[in-house]
Structures are given as C-alpha cells and as structure tokens.
C-alpha cells in the first residue's frame, strides 16, 4: 500500500519482524532480508548487478502497486541508470539467476544504477521468501 504509514496488511510486517528476531538465535539459518546488491559490472552497454547468494534465492521482479490509474507502474519501475554523464534515466531490468541486468536507451556505458531511490518508490525486486530489496545505489567496478 503506497503512501500509507499504516498499511492494511499488518501480518506481512509482523512476519518480517519475526524473521529478524529468529535470525538472532544461534542455529537459525534463515533469510531475514531481501536481495542485497554486492557488485556491478558492465558488459555490452548493460549493467550487471550481482546479489548475495544468501539473499537472492528465487529472486524475481513483481509488478509494483500503481500510484494512480492515470500512471500505472510496471514491473520495471523503480530502476534508474546513469551513464558517464551522471544523468539518471528510467531503466528496464530483468533477473538472471542471482544477477539483475539493467539498461536504458541512450546509456551505452553505465556508471551507476539506483533502485527504489525515490520518495515513495516502486518496490519490484523480491527474493523467494517474498522479502523486498532495500533501496540502493551501486557504482560500476572499473
């Protein structure tokens, strides 16, 4: 539920809090966070963002909730990519195992990628435990 500090789905918030608590106990080998970006490389004009295998199992893109009927978001919402000029453009993304490939028209040499880096961002990247990735900015390794 976008733009609501008091979401209706309280059970999901409680489930996530319980996972964080369980992780504190010795011997509890559970995933308590969404996909965590670890590295960005560039190949063929596209950014390749690698995620920690511990958090990226079953990683997938999910359609974001529409912010309004006039401007529905798609499952590619929330991603921006910047070239060497430093100007961020809305981007497309696709999951390949524990990697997300990000690209946009007009960006041939990616420098940086931002995910969910807005006020009230679209959240579209989840792992197999349906835990969302936190917002991040990542720079390409050169």
PLM regions and their residue ranges:
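C-terminal beta-sandwich/jelly-roll accessory domains of carbohydrate-active enzymes
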Residues: 54-142
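Catalytic cores of secreted or luminal carbohydrate-active enzymes
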Residues: 1-77
């Amino acid at each position: 539920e976008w733009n609501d500090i008091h979401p209706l789905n309280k059970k999901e918030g409680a489930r996530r809090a319980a996972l964080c608590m369980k992780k504190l106990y010795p011997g509890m080998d559970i995933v308590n966070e969404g996909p965590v970006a670890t590295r960005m490389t560039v190949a063929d004009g596209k950014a390749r963002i690698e995620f920690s295998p511990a958090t990226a199992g079953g990683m997938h893109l999910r359609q974001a909730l529409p912010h309004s009927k006039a401007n529905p978001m798609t499952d590619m919402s929330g991603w921006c990519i910047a070239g060497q000029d430093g100007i961020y453009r809305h981007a497309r993304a696709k999951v390949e195992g524990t990697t997300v490939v990000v690209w946009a028209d007009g960006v041939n040499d990616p420098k940086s990628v931002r995910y969910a880096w807005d006020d009230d961002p679209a959240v579209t990247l989840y792992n197999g435990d349906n835990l969302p990735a936190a917002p991040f900015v990542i720079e390409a390794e050169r």
